[in-house]
Swiss-Prot record:
Its main location: secreted. Precursor of the catalytic component of the C3 and C5 convertase complexes of the alternative pathway of the complement system, a cascade of proteins that leads to phagocytosis and breakdown of pathogens and signaling that strengthens the adaptive immune system. The alternative complement pathway acts as an amplification loop that enhances other complement pathways (classical, lectin and GZMK) by promoting formation of additional C3 and C5 convertases. CFB is cleaved and activated by CFD to generate Ba and Bb chains; Bb chain constituting the catalytic component of the C3 and C5 convertases. Residues 35-100, 101-160, 163-220 form the Sushi domain. Its EC number is 3.4.21.47. This is Complement factor B. SUPFAM superfamilies: Complement control module/SCR domain, Trypsin-like serine proteases, vWA-like. Residues 1-25 form the signal peptide. Residues 270-469 form the VWFA domain. Monomer. Interacts with complement C3b; this interaction is dependent on the presence of Mg(2+). Mg(2+) binds at residues 278, 280, 353. The keyword NADP does not apply. The active site is at residues 526, 576, 699. The unliganded VWA domain has an inactive 'locked' conformation whereby the scissile Arg-259|Lys-260 bond is protected from proteolytic activation.
């Protein structure tokens, strides 16, 4: 009955820009009706194959550490036969086989030696580099052959500093022509036959001592970027030091500063999302990419920034779904709604691949009416994410649009102030059919940065963007979770605390709580008695086995479970809240993070409300007078699961509260308001849906509203009408009057504000 409410998060906020370069890309032939191909004889020795594009292509799959030889993919030709198995030197092979992956040897290494020397290197082999006297080593002195056929670390370079520019090096597997590094000197790189060059083939020594373009590498068809490689390279590119920052930014030409992408809420950035919806992409990849973009928008918004969005899908023709000039283009919820409504079938009737027209659609959004630039145009960063396989088959070379864009934005015209940091593109190719030449041509090329990535499948793309999220600056943000499919229970509920109170000769009490700050856990007061000692209270967070030391338990002063015994009410749970103060400060991480509390600045940001938002306005947003979807976290079979419930805060509120009379000991209460005070929220019952109920061990845990990808606690689980978890098993069939009651945090805010005043929560 538990519900995983948060969508899979694929993407993090990152800067994406338009394309740069001038390389002619390779078109993909238009699809023609063709015969189906027989699968007889297509097997691969030591591996398997899977069909792609409804049987019109196949991919060979080998175990880890092996690659398909001589090709990774084959296509079904119009003659009804599969494409021939040919090696890199065009020799025909009769049968495909899985061969062990090797890493290439250095073709050349200048001004030094490497050891050991070998024609090739096996996975896990190491190689060491040493420089001659008078030369200094840059990069990695020791490198290891990895399972994907690439070397670990960075290119080793021996340099004596004699050139105007430093030696650009020879990446392993490439060949370099040119050994002079004076101003405006150039070097060129080449790959062996059958390998594809990624990065810049030609690099020129520029003013300031930097090289144009980006470091090249030689790629085999079976090579993919691992999620970790992509994440590290991407994050590195965002913070790379650059020169020639726009003087209007307060930095003179040649002055260095960190390349930081600033998502300014005032709207100094336009993010264009361009998604290939052609036949070669396929419906499943299109849907997966769309989900990733939805989560990108959500993630950017969760950090409190509001760039303007443009949204384009394309096949034979582009479709502009959102323009940056639309009034709501900076409204993340509205843009997400438009994206969710896009279907792969929207391009079904004309399903070619016209990347050039898609970029022209972006250009049209960037250009100005009557060619008159608006004020501040030169301070706006234009950004894009392009998800494609690079197989354009109509419309011409998309690179030709780039010159127009660069001219429009005055990019690269002033050598002292090239404004290159206002124009970037990161191209993500997904799957085995990606055209590496084309996606490389479409990506920006900047020194010490990587902008083009090839990942194995959509699942790997998810991994990429999870790993891109730099948690270090956001761990203290409340109500955020790591919703990765590989995440543990505490990645998905990082605020959840387990509480145990040991009472000699009386057994123990189990409860839940929520981390609300680095020193405090919020829970229910009834979990403790006045006789409990701090050393008998055990608290654990983040799934850790160690218990945290307790300094003190703070009860709400109005809590008194025996307060109405004289009136025949055996237990009275009004103000059933307590704060556990820890002796030592919690160290936030992916599995330990605070939940949001009402009427705090953090919740205002989480809900994307104006800074002037009042506590009452937060209450109206979180607890409107209606049925409110919420959740609590329960432990079942040692696993934390989310249970979706509805807070009855509208016309069902009265009937929900009246069912309290069915609770043991309350059957003789004449006025139910004697036990259900205004401090309670009510869940449970069968309308509008059959709500799951809490169990005894859930007491003290948070009642949560999940909104805009953030989790805000609105209540503390207190008591229930029916024990639905007898014999440690949750009953599936429960009576309609099975209700649960929770302390409404809006009703105990003065106490929370007083006790948490030193926790920097910014109470309103």
């Amino acid at each position: 009955m538990g519900s995983n409410l948060s969508p899979q998060l694929c993407l993090m906020p990152f800067i994406l820009g338009l394309l740069s370069g001038g390389v002619t890309t390779t078109p993909w032939p238009l699809a023609q009706p063709q015969e189906s191909c027989s699968l007889e004889g297509v097997e691969i020795k030591g591996g398997s194959f899977r069909l792609l594009q409804e049987g019109q292509a196949l991919e060979y799959v080998c175990p880890s550490g092996f690659y398909p030889y001589p090709v990774q993919t084959r296509t079904c030709r119009s003659t009804g036969s599969w494409s021939t198995l040919k090696t890199q030197v065009q020799k025909t092979v009769r049968k495909a086989e899985c061969r062990a992956i090797h890493c290439p040897r250095p073709h050349d290494f200048e001004n030094g030696e490497y050891w050991p020397r070998s024609p090739y290197y096996n996975v896990s082999d190491e190689i060491s580099f040493h420089c001659y006297d008078g030369y200094t080593l840059r990069g990695s002195a020791n490198r290891t052959c990895q399972v994907n056929g690439r070397w670990s670390g960075q290119t080793a370079i021996c340099d004596n500093g004699a050139g105007y520019c430093s030696n650009p090096g020879i990446p392993i597997g490439t060949r370099k022509v040119g050994s002079q590094y004076r101003l405006e000197d150039s070097v060129t790189y080449h790959c062996s036959r059958g390998l594809t060059l990624r990065g810049s083939q030609r690099r020129t020594c520029q003013e300031g001592g930097s090289w144009s373009g980006t470091e090249p590498s030689c790629q085999d068809s079976f090579m993919y970027d691992t999620p970790q490689e992509v994440a590290e390279a991407f994050l590195s590119s965002l913070t790379e030091t650059i020169e020639g920052v726009d003087a209007e930014d307060g930095h003179g030409p040649g002055e260095q500063q960190k390349r930081k992408i600033v998502l300014d809420p005032s709207g100094s950035m336009n993010i264009y999302l361009v998604l290939d919806g052609s036949d070669s992409i396929g419906a499943s990849n299109f849907t997966g990419a769309k989900k990733c973009l939805v989560n990108l928008i959500e993630k950017v918004a969760s950090y409190g920034v509001k760039p303007r969005y443009g949204l384009v899908t394309y096949a034979t023709h582009p479709k502009i779904w959102v323009k940056v000039s639309d009034p709501d283009s900076s409204n993340a919820d509205w843009v997400t709604k438009q994206l969710n409504e896009i279907n792969y079938e929207d391009h079904k009737l004309k399903s070619g691949t016209n990347t050039k027209k898609a970029l022209q659609a972006v250009y049209s959004m960037m250009s100005w009416p009557d060619d008159i630039p608006p004020e501040g145009w030169n301070r706006t960063r234009h950004v894009i994410i392009l998800m494609t396989d690079g197989l354009h088959n109509m419309g011409g070379d998309p690179i030709t649009v780039i010159d127009e864009i660069r001219d429009l934005l005055y990019i690269g015209k002033d050598r002292k102030n090239p404004r290159e940091d206002y124009l970037d593109v990161y191209v993500f190719g997904v799957g085995p059919l990606v055209n590496q030449v084309n996606i490389n041509a479409l990506a920006s090329k900047k020194d010490n940065e990587q902008h083009v990535f090839k990942v194995k499948d959509m699942e790997n793309l998810e991994d990429v963007f999870y790993q891109m999220i730099d948690e270090s600056q956001s761990l203290s943000l409340c109500g955020m979770v790591w919703e990765h499919r590989k995440g543990t229970d505490y990645h998905k509920q990082p605020w959840q605390a387990k509480i145990s109170v040991i009472r000699p000769s009386k057994g123990h009490e189990s409860c839940m709580g929520a981390v609300v700050s680095e020193y405090f856990v919020l829970t229910a007061a009834h979990c403790f008695t006045v006789d409990d000692k701090e050393h008998s209270i055990k608290v654990s967070v983040g799934g850790e086995k160690r218990d945290l030391e307790i300094e003190v338990v703070l009860f709400h002063p109005n809590y008194n479970i025996n307060g109405k015994k004289a009136a025949g009410i055996p237990e009275f749970y009004d103000y059933d809240v307590a704060l556990i103060k820890l002796k030592n400060k919690l160290k936030y991480g992916q599995t330990i993070r605070p939940i949001c509390l009402p009427c705090t600045e953090g919740t205002t940001r989480a809900l994307r409300l104006p800074p002037t938002t009042t506590c009452q306005q937060q209450k109206e947003e979180l607890l409107p007078a209606q049925d409110i979807k919420a959740l609590f976290v329960s432990e079942e079979e040692k696993k934390l699961t989310r249970k979706e419930v509805y807070i009855k805060n509208g016309d069902k509120k009265g009937s929900c509260e009246r069912d309290a009379q069915y609770a043991p000991g309350y059957d003789k209460v004449k006025d139910i308001s004697e036990v259900v005070t205004p401090r309670f929220l009510c869940t449970g019952g069968v309308s509008p849906y059959a709500d799951p109920n809490t169990c005894r061990g859930d007491s003290g845990g948070p009642l949560i509203v999940h909104k805009r990808s953030r989790f805000i606690q609105v209540g503390v689980i207190s008591w229930g009408v029916v024990d639905v978890c007898k014999n440690q098993k949750r009953q599936k069939q429960v009576p309609a009057h099975a209700r649960d009651f929770h302390i409404n945090l809006f009703q105990v805010l003065p106490w929370l504000k007083e006790k948490l005043q030193d926790e920097d929560l910014g109470f309103l």
